């Protein structure tokens, strides 16, 4: 299978500048129906959303970046809010979003993580992650198998 090597920044739009963290106190005042995401998933529900669509969230910090007890990337869709502990990604025409999800969760990215007490995947380091990508048609074929297996 022929692949091309890209840095993540070449195949994705990073939407981190749209993140707005809310303190626990602020979230209590703003309870609602929209999911509020942190590094590892939904941590609350709030009354408004910042994003509407399908995105890939990649954990920015936390122990799980080293222990990998859970996936560090997750696909989210619909209307939601994200705090400043998860990177927000949309892919371009070179890469399917769900393909990147599987790829990131199966890669060793330890070389891009800094911090010993509090592991962190900075935006600058995340943009440098090297990815081997096949063409879109091949990605679609691989995804059809992976998604079928995941549904079982």
Task: Kindly give the residue locations of the regions a language model identified.
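Short secondary-structure capping/turn segments at boundaries of alpha-helices and beta-strands
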Residues: 21-24, 43-45
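Residues that form generic nucleotide/phosphate-binding pockets
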Residues: 11-14, 103, 112
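Non-catalytic DNA-recognition/assembly elements of restriction-modification systems
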Residues: 1-20, 26-38, 128-140, 144-152
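A common structural junction motif
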Residues: 107-111, 148
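Generic structural signal for secondary-structure transition and capping sites
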Residues: 16-17, 42, 109
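A short beta-sheet element
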Residues: 38-105, 114-117, 122-126
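Short, flexible active-site-proximal loops enriched in glycine and acidic residues
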Residues: 97, 110-117, 132-142
